[in-house]
């Protein structure tokens, strides 16, 4: 156990939710839309020979322009852009779904240069800011970074459900995310049999052990180690006293947060857990994956629907965060202190392939929803003919935005030094409030 109070006392009342859109999303129907056949770009189309199924896409409206002829591969009308009301710089594809009503909070980053089309490498690059070293992560992931910077005294600094979480030595080891395949797996580990002792007896044992650890700490030359034991035992007491099993039980979460559409994707339950865990103040960072975006074939017809389900989930998540009081800041809501980042491996090709799907492409977009970032804001661009990232001004010259830039900006927003965690990347201050 490392020193119990290591690191600066920063952002101790903030919470973080990280979502990986697994498989590589098609930004041309979502965050960086295209509805014209220009250059090598084949926009999504509806109709009998179209590339997608528009029926379940609530914001799909056939374009008033002439139908697009994709030769033997596809043909049909594309879509009308989706814009927020008022004079907004944001433009979306029809997959944005219910999240459109929260557009005033959204920070969209387009034209992110990935320099890879490998799922594993792109995922690691997006979450750590470093490409893989062979098959191994070269840096810790963003949930580990924020757990180290803000959550070491939390009961669970970081909990990761199928998220690309990595730990590389440097941050405090208490920041290592608890990685599980499902929320229910954590619930199973919390079940205690009453056959041998009662909850009160277990609590009494924890009290004695905590007192003993502190007493030994007063006599030890390495008091921090024993104080760390005491903190862990205190955390175990809080966990037992809160009946945390309910927070990790799927049926309980579904009943408590019944406006989520749990049938949309197995990952939706993780969003409900995030609200419950933050409300109880037991987790600093919740990270999870929302999958099924790898659409190389005719399964591309469902790509906009999968994105709509993702964005609908985030919209409902924000609704709950708006309604829930912050556990330690009276008068504030969870949404005042919860920060969300969404990213994918990379994006999909602007061309439709012969299988009526899209392949891998070294461009990307990211979405941030945070009170510390400018809302109703977009930064970065991809070119209109090839969907490749366009350069912008940085201190080292003109270049495209990269994942390390996005991660550095996010880390810096909470008073932490990006250089503690990231080798590369420049803080993009234009994205931050103030």
What are these regions, as identified by a protein language model?
Residues 1-434:
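Ligand-binding pockets and gating/stacking loops
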